[in-house]
């Protein structure tokens, strides 16, 4: 009984289709191998299984090279070389553009592979990198030379021209720095002044009073309360402070015919003499103004003859006490 001829049509069962492909694939690859060895030809075999697994075979020449030869053939030769077992089917390629695109991609990948495997191409890339490194080193050296202009080494100078050029460069740089500083100060002057200003705690009244205490020169006497200050300096300071008061009191006493109270200083080395005038009428007038709403006026309570009390000086009192002492001493001695 003979072998049943298999009908050539698509196998509907997926498992049977995969098994049939595995069996016939091995036989097809074996036939291609035998053909490439026996006939010494360039052969390329590409297959995709029903599960989209790729199977490749090539003889002594790579698949990329075989396809490159196919692309370089004229169009007529490629069309005439197509072989169809079914003679009723005319050669027709529906997706010719797609095939050409795939072949071009394969050619590009082939060129890349050749460049990688070719040592000459690698050496050319290394040479380009070396040239780039040299160029960057030159730029770095030029930048270092520019920086050395701002820190010149006088030992390296051999002529006066080099000194003059270096001096001019430094002066120009200094000018630019000063201009930049002035620009920044002009822009930030308002904020700088606001941060450095301090408010006056005492106010204008206290400042005027303190300035009145100081001499006319306006110098700040930092040694005012210094214990180590010399007596002459203290005397000069006190005279400068109380001289306006003495002048004012003496002028007012001369105008109003008032008596003065003089205090004599027996130790004149330490402190100078000073005098202060008091007016009895002015004193009572001020007291009367302060106590107007409290009771009757002082002038009504006092007699008319006591309205003006003569001033008694300290010198008169001292003389009177001395005279009394001189009269009492003989009396005590006689007893």
From Swiss-Prot:
Q: What is this protein called?
A: Agamous-like MADS-box protein AGL104
Supply one GO BP term.
Answer: positive regulation of transcription by RNA polymerase II
What this protein is reported to do is described as:
Probable transcription factor that forms heterodimers with the MADS-box proteins AGL30 and AGL65 and is involved in the regulation of pollen maturation at the late stages of pollen development and pollen tube growth.
* Annotated segments matching region Disordered: 302-335
MADS-box domain location, by residue? 1-61
The record ties this protein, via InterPro entries, to: MADS-box/MEF2_TF, MEF2-like_N, TF_MADSbox, TF_MADSbox_sf
How does the annotation summarize its subunit structure? Forms heterodimers with AGL30 and AGL65.
Q: Which residues form a coiled coil?
A: 124-151
Major localisation: nucleus
Please give the positions of the paired cysteines in each disulfide bond.
none
* Keywords associated with the record: Coiled coil, DNA-binding, Nucleus, Transcription, Transcription regulation
A cellular component annotation (GO) from this entry:
nucleus
PROSITE patterns recorded: MADS_BOX_1, MADS_BOX_2
């Amino acid at each position: 009984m003979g072998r049943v001829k298999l009908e050539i049509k698509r196998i509907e069962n997926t498992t049977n289709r995969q098994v049939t492909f595995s069996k016939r694939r091995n036989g097809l690859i074996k036939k291609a191998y035998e053909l490439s060895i026996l006939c010494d030809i360039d052969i390329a075999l590409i297959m995709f299984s029903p599960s989209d697994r790729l199977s490749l075979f090539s003889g002594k020449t790579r698949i990329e090279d075989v396809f490159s030869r196919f692309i370089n053939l004229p169009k007529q030769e490629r069309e005439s070389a197509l072989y169809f077992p079914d003679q009723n089917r005319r050669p027709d390629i529906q997706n010719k553009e797609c095939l050409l695109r795939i072949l071009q991609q394969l050619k590009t990948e082939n060129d890349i592979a050749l460049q990688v495997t070719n040592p000459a191409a690698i050496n050319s890339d290394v040479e380009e990198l070396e040239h780039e490194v040299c160029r960057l080193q030159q730029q770095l050296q030029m930048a270092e030379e520019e920086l050395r202009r701002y820190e010149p080494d006088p030992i390296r100078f051999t002529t006066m021209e080099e000194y003059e050029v270096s001096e001019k460069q430094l002066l120009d740089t200094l000018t630019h720095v000063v201009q930049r500083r002035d620009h920044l100060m002009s822009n930030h002057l308002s904020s700088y002044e606001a941060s450095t200003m301090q408010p006056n705690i005492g106010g204008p009244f206290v400042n005027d009073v303190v300035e009145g205490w100081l001499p006319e020169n306006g110098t700040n006497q930092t040694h005012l309360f210094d214990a180590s200050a010399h007596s002459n300096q203290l005397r000069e300071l006190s005279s400068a402070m109380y001289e306006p008061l003495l002048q004012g009191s003496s002028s007012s006493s001369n105008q109003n015919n008032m008596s003065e109270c003089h205090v004599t200083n027996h130790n004149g080395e330490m402190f100078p003499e000073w005098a202060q005038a008091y007016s009895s009428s002015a004193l009572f007038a001020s007291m009367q103004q302060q106590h107007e709403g409290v009771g009757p006026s002082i002038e009504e309570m006092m007699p008319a003859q006591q309205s003006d009390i003569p001033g008694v000086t300290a010198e008169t009192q001292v003389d009177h006490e001395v005279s009394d002492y001189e009269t009492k001493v003989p009396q005590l001695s006689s007893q």
